[in-house]
């Protein structure tokens, strides 16, 4: 079984970690922050994002997460609204764009991943350097508080 080191528990990092661990690879997910509750950008979840979560088997992670339907986009210049574009709602049954609490979604996916025996989450670990031998990248050197450690893997 291969071992994968993933640096960063953003949307791509947590989704990749979950999928690889679900498929049997050993996964170590490192995140420099100790909590997910921080300011994020891009908290809009488009219909394709919801579809991707459904395909990964993570749609239920959306339940209970603060969210609201996006009705329109307002464009401001010099603090004056210049244009409003109504968000198309699509056909009945089509998923609309939602504004979500991204940190709650990331936390839910990590919690789901922690149910897998081959997944390890390392909050508070900040990557300092790459670890290599010859031409091969083997992992990362990371620090958490006063502790320093090498995380090595196959991929």
Label each residue range with its predicted role.
Residues 34-54:
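Conserved N-terminal glycine-rich FAD pyrophosphate-binding loop of Rossmann-like flavoproteins
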Residues 14-15, 48:
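Short alpha-helical segment within the catalytic ATP-binding CA
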Residues 51, 59-155:
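Conserved N-terminal helical subregion
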Residues 21-41:
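Glycine-rich FAD pyrophosphate-binding loop
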Residues 2, 24, 153-154:
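Short, well-ordered alpha-helix to beta-strand connector turns
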Residues 1-12:
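Beta1/beta-strand and adjacent pyrophosphate-binding region of the FAD-binding site
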Residues 3, 26-28, 120:
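Structural signature of beta-strand start/N-cap positions in the alpha/beta core
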